[in-house]
Amino acid sequence: MDTIAAISTPMGEGAIAIIRLSGPEAVQIADRMYKGPKEKKLVSVDSHTIHYGHIVDARTDQVIEEVMVSVLRAPKTFTREDVIEINCHGGIVTVNKVLQLALREGARLAEPGEFTKRAFLNGRIDLSQAEAVMDLIRAKTDRAMNVAITQMEGRLSGLVQRLRGEILETLAHIEVNIDYPEYDDVEEMTHRVLVEKATSVKKEIESLLSTSHQGKILREGLSTVIIGRPNVGKSSLLNSLVQETKAIVTDIPGTTRDVIEEYVNVRGVPLRLVDTAGIRETEDIVERIGVERSRQVLKEADLILLVLNYSEELSEEDIKLFEAVSGMDIIVIVNKTDLEPKLDVEKVKQLAKDRPVVTTSLLQEKGIDELEMAIQSLFFTGSIESGDLTYVSNTRHIALLQAAKQSIEDALEGIEMDVPIDIVQIDLTRCWEQLGEIIGDAVHESLIDQLFSQFCLGK
């Protein structure tokens, strides 16, 4: 493999920036750029050491930057290759000069995610662990971060490998029974034993899949739409949850003319919170565009926060909103409880059916805690911070687990129908292969390229 280089820290001004190199010539390339005290040579220093010096353009003898250089030799590195990390002052011009010098000395500019890709290809991590690196970078809450870390540490990989081991052991047992029926040393794979083993695998796959809904919420955020008639307090609710003024809050109905989106951490649940223009008929062209966008995001929502006005009677428009979100996960928020009551709350509870109804006075900052608790309890039972569960959050993993579950169910159905054992063997083998794809066993190269292309440059 050639040697790659990239800036591993965000571009812009900052205290420190890092340029990373990885590959067989990483140390030699850095050595040609580096000038240390007492003629120190990086090619001669020990692994996992850091060295003060300067980056110098050998052609002009110009000092480019004062640096600290980390030397990390294979195989005890992230990529299992020789790795150099040049720590310099943050700044667009200086950092790019150091990178350009590394490229001139023989490195190639890394592709997005190529360092992590090399870690995978060199056996340092499996594919699910590699994907967890990006999940960690993109985590919006502490819990999402913890889920990514447990996956990086190999908890999901370990479970998948154990399941594959159980299936492989069963397949080997079947193979011996088929090819060497005369062997008395090997116990016969009876109908009962085969059902027990396949059922055990199925239950474990189902257990993993049972965490997928919550896992996807933690990974991607809960698409949450705030709806209600104009001027019931939708934008005030958004601002209360975000805790800063993002939407325009006035007494004029219809002020929010577009869709406003913001990520919010609610008791460990990441909400992709959307405040919409009121869904109503309007002659205003700009407002009408906002209303149409509101209808679209409503269809795609995971959670609806339906806001009502405590100081006004329930209107036909309110009832239509209840009808529009029928069958969806909703929390009804009765706002403006600081004003004179006119709303029939019992009627609201009837319309809400068994969905939560929370009373608030956003002006007086009352009811927000109760709303946050309602959101958490709607999607997570017990403490969301529990580290006992292995959450499956990646869409690719979920699809493969669902396919593996179908394969094991096909095997069980075949056993019950008393089909030939070699047919059952095909279904078990397919299940084994599908589980293997989660950790990157026998994955097509184009899929690997596509997955790592989503990473940021320098990772």
From Swiss-Prot:
<dbReference type="GO" id="GO:0003924">
    <property type="term" value="F:GTPase activity"/>
</dbReference>
<dbReference type="Pfam" id="PF01926">
    <property type="entry name" value="MMR_HSR1"/>
</dbReference>
<dbReference type="Pfam" id="PF10396">
    <property type="entry name" value="TrmE_N"/>
</dbReference>
<dbReference type="InterPro" id="IPR006073">
    <property type="entry name" value="GTP-bd"/>
</dbReference>
<keyword id="KW-0630">Potassium</keyword>
<feature type="binding site">
    <location>
        <position position="459"/>
    </location>
    <ligand>
        <name>(6S)-5-formyl-5,6,7,8-tetrahydrofolate</name>
    </ligand>
</feature>
<keyword id="KW-0479">Metal-binding</keyword>
<dbReference type="InterPro" id="IPR027266">
    <property type="entry name" value="TrmE/GcvT_dom1"/>
</dbReference>
<feature type="binding site">
    <location>
        <position position="256"/>
    </location>
    <ligand>
        <name>Mg(2+)</name>
    </ligand>
</feature>
<dbReference type="InterPro" id="IPR027417">
    <property type="entry name" value="P-loop_NTPase"/>
</dbReference>
<feature type="binding site">
    <location>
        <position position="124"/>
    </location>
    <ligand>
        <name>(6S)-5-formyl-5,6,7,8-tetrahydrofolate</name>
    </ligand>
</feature>
<feature type="binding site">
    <location>
        <position position="235"/>
    </location>
    <ligand>
        <name>Mg(2+)</name>
    </ligand>
</feature>
<dbReference type="InterPro" id="IPR031168">
    <property type="entry name" value="G_TrmE"/>
</dbReference>
<comment type="function">
    <text>Exhibits a very high intrinsic GTPase hydrolysis rate. Involved in the addition of a carboxymethylaminomethyl (cmnm) group at the wobble position (U34) of certain tRNAs, forming tRNA-cmnm(5)s(2)U34.</text>
</comment>
<comment type="subunit">
    <text>Homodimer. Heterotetramer of two MnmE and two MnmG subunits.</text>
</comment>
<protein>
    <recommendedName>
        <fullName>tRNA modification GTPase MnmE</fullName>
        <ecNumber>3.6.-.-</ecNumber>
    </recommendedName>
</protein>
<feature type="binding site">
    <location>
        <begin position="231"/>
        <end position="236"/>
    </location>
    <ligand>
        <name>GTP</name>
    </ligand>
</feature>
<keyword id="KW-0963">Cytoplasm</keyword>
<dbReference type="InterPro" id="IPR025867">
    <property type="entry name" value="MnmE_helical"/>
</dbReference>
<feature type="binding site">
    <location>
        <begin position="275"/>
        <end position="278"/>
    </location>
    <ligand>
        <name>GTP</name>
    </ligand>
</feature>
<feature type="binding site">
    <location>
        <position position="252"/>
    </location>
    <ligand>
        <name>K(+)</name>
    </ligand>
</feature>
<dbReference type="InterPro" id="IPR004520">
    <property type="entry name" value="GTPase_MnmE"/>
</dbReference>
<feature type="domain" description="TrmE-type G">
    <location>
        <begin position="221"/>
        <end position="380"/>
    </location>
</feature>
<dbReference type="GO" id="GO:0030488">
    <property type="term" value="P:tRNA methylation"/>
</dbReference>
<keyword id="KW-0547">Nucleotide-binding</keyword>
<keyword id="KW-0819">tRNA processing</keyword>
<keyword id="KW-0378">Hydrolase</keyword>
<dbReference type="InterPro" id="IPR018948">
    <property type="entry name" value="GTP-bd_TrmE_N"/>
</dbReference>
<comment type="similarity">
    <text>Belongs to the TRAFAC class TrmE-Era-EngA-EngB-Septin-like GTPase superfamily. TrmE GTPase family.</text>
</comment>
<feature type="binding site">
    <location>
        <position position="20"/>
    </location>
    <ligand>
        <name>(6S)-5-formyl-5,6,7,8-tetrahydrofolate</name>
    </ligand>
</feature>
<feature type="binding site">
    <location>
        <position position="255"/>
    </location>
    <ligand>
        <name>K(+)</name>
    </ligand>
</feature>
<dbReference type="Pfam" id="PF12631">
    <property type="entry name" value="MnmE_helical"/>
</dbReference>
<dbReference type="GO" id="GO:0046872">
    <property type="term" value="F:metal ion binding"/>
</dbReference>
<dbReference type="InterPro" id="IPR027368">
    <property type="entry name" value="MnmE_dom2"/>
</dbReference>
<dbReference type="GO" id="GO:0005525">
    <property type="term" value="F:GTP binding"/>
</dbReference>
<feature type="binding site">
    <location>
        <position position="231"/>
    </location>
    <ligand>
        <name>K(+)</name>
    </ligand>
</feature>
<feature type="binding site">
    <location>
        <begin position="250"/>
        <end position="256"/>
    </location>
    <ligand>
        <name>GTP</name>
    </ligand>
</feature>
<feature type="binding site">
    <location>
        <position position="85"/>
    </location>
    <ligand>
        <name>(6S)-5-formyl-5,6,7,8-tetrahydrofolate</name>
    </ligand>
</feature>
<dbReference type="InterPro" id="IPR005225">
    <property type="entry name" value="Small_GTP-bd"/>
</dbReference>
<dbReference type="GO" id="GO:0005829">
    <property type="term" value="C:cytosol"/>
</dbReference>
<dbReference type="GO" id="GO:0002098">
    <property type="term" value="P:tRNA wobble uridine modification"/>
</dbReference>
<keyword id="KW-0460">Magnesium</keyword>
